[in-house]
Amino acid sequence: MGHHGQMHAQHGVTMPADSPIGQPDRSEQRYFPATAFRTRRSTLSDAQRQTWDRRWPELGLSVGPAEDPDRPGPPLDTDAWFGRKAPVVLEIGCGNGTSTLAMAKEEPGVDVIAVEVYRRGLAQLLCAIDRDNVTNIRLIRGNALDVLQRLIAPASLTGVRVFFPDPWPKARHHKRRFLQPGTVGLIADRLLPGGVLHVATDHAGYAEHIADVGAGEPRLRPANPDSPLPISVARPTTKYETKAQDAGSAVTEFIWLRR
């Protein structure tokens, strides 16, 4: 386990009470990232396309930009989607789903919603779900900020995972980093009391930024390493992480609890 964020006084974005699912105040948009993902072409293999066509209608959901972002509509009915009532974890930026699949298998009593903008990564995960007959994962293709704002109800998530988000290392691109005060505030709003925000990064500069942003959100507190948690925080080591460590990059992890 890596380092936890240290607490100091800052303030995150506030959520107006009159919004159906806590839409952030328009005046606070500077607290949110600009485009937080890169444009990428994604081509599926024939096998991936066949699995996609067969399983996506059941397990997947595509989310585009809202026509009227001030009226996000009703939140997602996760009990109906999964066919049961269970703790729900939202994983933001699941990539090809290596960690998603492994962690879902280890906790069959926890339902996982994996969000990713790139179709190829989702297709790889969907094929693995189909191959291994995993029943506790659902997929959303779209911008995670749209998902949090429009589909997730306040105080509905047991956990949120953000593993190795794009660090956007150039200073002029820092505004594109996903974990900004507004985003972390929105995540805190969506977590149940006692819920977990679990973040990992291998970029030292982004780690400092994340520590500051997390410390500035008053609804979050660093988890005590000895305290029991409602979900597992044991991640598998991915090929990407191994490559980063071989290159000399240290992985920093943050685990916060919703107050």
From Swiss-Prot:
Q: What Gene Ontology molecular function terms does this protein carry?
A: tRNA (guanine(46)-N7)-methyltransferase activity
Positions of S-adenosyl-L-methionine binding: 91, 116, 143, 166
Q: What keywords appear on the UniProt entry?
A: Methyltransferase, S-adenosyl-L-methionine, Transferase, tRNA processing
Q: Where does substrate bind?
A: 170, 202, 238-241
Annotated region (Disordered), positions in chain: 1-73
Q: What SUPFAM superfamilies does this protein map onto?
A: S-adenosyl-L-methionine-dependent methyltransferases
Active site positions: 166
Tell whether tRNA processing is among the UniProt keywords.
yes
InterPro entries this protein is in?
SAM-dependent_MTases_sf, tRNA_(Gua-N-7)_MeTrfase_Trmb, tRNA_methyltr_TrmB_bact
Q: Name one GO cellular component term.
A: tRNA methyltransferase complex
Q: Which reaction does it catalyse?
A: guanosine(46) in tRNA + S-adenosyl-L-methionine = N(7)-methylguanosine(46) in tRNA + S-adenosyl-L-homocysteine
State one Pfam family annotation: Methyltransf_4
Instruction: Check the record and name the Gene3D superfamilies matching this protein.
Output: Vaccinia Virus protein VP39 (3.40.50.150)
Q: What is its EC number?
A: 2.1.1.33
Q: Which domain of life is it from?
A: Bacteria
The pathway entry for this protein reads as: tRNA modification; N(7)-methylguanine-tRNA biosynthesis
- The reply on keyword Methyltransferase is yes
Instruction: Please give the family membership noted in the entry.
Output: Belongs to the class I-like SAM-binding methyltransferase superfamily. TrmB family.
Protein task: Catalyzes the formation of N(7)-methylguanine at position 46 (m7G46) in tRNA.
Q: What is this protein called?
A: tRNA (guanine-N(7)-)-methyltransferase
